[in-house]
Amino acid sequence: MTNRRLFVAALALAAAVLAGAGALRAQTIQRGLYVSALTDAGAPIPDLGPADFVVREDNMAREVLKVEPAIEAMQIAVLVDTSQAARDQIAHVRTALPAFVKTLTTGEVRNEVAIIAIGERPTVFTNYTFSQAELQKGIDRIWSVQGSGTYLLDGIIETSQGFKKRGAGRPVIVALLSEGPELSNRQHDQVLEPLRAGHVAFHVITMGHPSSSLSEEARERNRVLDEAPRATGGRREELLTSMALGAKLTQLADELTHQYKVTYAHPPSLIPPERVTVAAARPGVTARGTLIKEDKGRP
């Protein structure tokens, strides 16, 4: 009789454990990231699945549930340095941008692109549209402004605020910069916070020899250029000459149009994670991710 009672008790305990596990699975929240998976040469890698990615929340591994092509439309703000220091790069910028915006706006996915100048003060040349003709009008307005400096940090903040007002679901900033003086009077955390809060992927390409300025504005800008791409799943490229810009923009457009949507399991919790990261599960692959807007953790 004693053995029978022990057996029944063991069955009851096992059933309770299974029921609890089932309830926990039922309560699991699905969260997602837009992820770039690239070779060492920067080319997108096709046909990846859940086993190819490792997602962590505050260094705790989470189960990857699903991996699929990201087909949601992007809202892409191209911030162009039109300061006096960008004068020698402007011709290459004007030449490289048409193919970039064509790739982003061609096809079934209706990505919207805006052209925004950040020399002198942030100015919208072409608002968000998938019309290549309208975007070309904005590109044609790109010229350096005599006597002006760069207002990158102001431009990032204002663009992030604009994404919020528009309810952008997949916002992206691509900044094309000279190494001229930064004139925004901003702290780096004032810039990073709206990027994180808005789930904005920030990519930046700088052209020219690195600046040796020790001004406070230069230090704050350098911190943003260092931290923002890593914090938001973007990329940072440093070109000594703007002649290479066309190839880099082609590579970036290829990356943006071949991202994955990675869905993972987040356990029920009253406290959102401070940091969400994604990595490749095998060598030779680089993975970068941007947390999808409806999620509350920080990428």
Annotate each language-model stretch with its function:
Residues 1-4:
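N-terminal secretory signal peptides that target proteins for export/translocation
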